């Protein structure tokens, strides 16, 4: 079976075509990276998978259902999540929020709290459950958002640039937390970081209106073709670390 099936899928914002007649599958249990230039349609694909946007034409099935109807079986990790610093919400409360859509106020039962604590263990933050979100570093916050998604016990995990705002050391913790999850669910990871995609996924979908699947690791010629001469971000984390890029402060 397929976790995602796209057949002749198209989508436009007004007169601007973003996704143009694409067909591809993501198999059950498969981890897939989504790469490509800015504005190519990567985040739009995630919105379509979540049912936040509807295709203009073609067919999209997610977990065997029309996109949107399977929303409660999907975990979603956004690029960043912010909470009002004046409201001291705890880490465990944030993780429990992930179950509200599925269970309503039943999300706060003892059983659900145990599931939330288990999700925090999977991302190595079990000792942080009573801390407030504002106390955490950027990397720790991202791992909390993974735990929040995992607490829903999803069949499909979608992530949108989850390491964009964290530094190298935090990213390593993030990778460690995520690597152990691949066997439990299908994963779609949107990222500009080609090294991250190579480490955590089985193949890559290049999105630039059309979609092309690439095996990993990507060769230099393929990378140049994907980004079409546009200025790319620096993908090599080791080089970034050696150059002393600590522009994003993170104590994770």
Residue ranges of each PLM-predicted region?
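Conserved ABC ATPase signature
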Residues: 132-136, 140
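The feature captures the beta-strand-to-loop junction immediately N-terminal to the Walker
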Residues: 35-37
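Conserved ABC transporter NBD signature motif
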Residues: 58-72
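Helix-to-loop junction immediately C-terminal to a conserved catalytic motif
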Residues: 50
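Conserved ABC ATPase "signature" region
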Residues: 96, 110-128
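Conserved beta-strand-loop-alpha-helix hinge in the C-terminal portion
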Residues: 207-235
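Catalytic Walker B motif of ABC-type/P-loop ATPase nucleotide-binding domains
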Residues: 157-161
């Amino acid at each position: 079976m397929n976790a995602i099936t796209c057949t002749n899928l198209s989508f436009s914002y007004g007169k601007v075509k973003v996704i143009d007649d694409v067909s591809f599958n993501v198999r059950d249990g498969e981890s897939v990276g989504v790469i490509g230039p800015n504005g190519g349609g990567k985040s739009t694909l995630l919105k379509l998978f979540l049912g936040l946007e509807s295709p203009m034409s073609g067919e999209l099935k997610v977990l065997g259902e029309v996109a949107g109807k399977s929303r409660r079986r999907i975990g979603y990790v956004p690029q960043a999540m912010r909470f009002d610093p004046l409201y001291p919400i705890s880490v465990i409360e944030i993780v429990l929020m992930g179950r509200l859509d599925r269970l309503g106020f039943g999300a706060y039962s003892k059983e659900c709290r145990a599931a939330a604590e288990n999700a925090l263990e999977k991302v190595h933050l079990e000792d942080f459950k009573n801390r407030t979100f504002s106390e955490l570093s950027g990397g720790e916050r991202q791992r909390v958002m993974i735990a929040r998604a995992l607490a829903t016990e999803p069949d499909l995990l979608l992530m949108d640039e989850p390491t964009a705002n964290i530094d190298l050391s935090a990213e390593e913790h993030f990778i460690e937390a995520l690597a152990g999850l691949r066997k439990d669910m299908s994963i779609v990871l949107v990222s500009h970081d080609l090294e991250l995609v190579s480490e955590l996924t089985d193949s890559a979908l290049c999105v630039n209106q059309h979609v092309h699947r690439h095996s990993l690791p990507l060769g230099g010629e393929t990378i140049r073709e994907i980004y079409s001469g546009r200025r790319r971000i620096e993908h090599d984390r080791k080089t970034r670390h050696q150059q002393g890029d600590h522009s994003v402060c993170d104590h994770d």
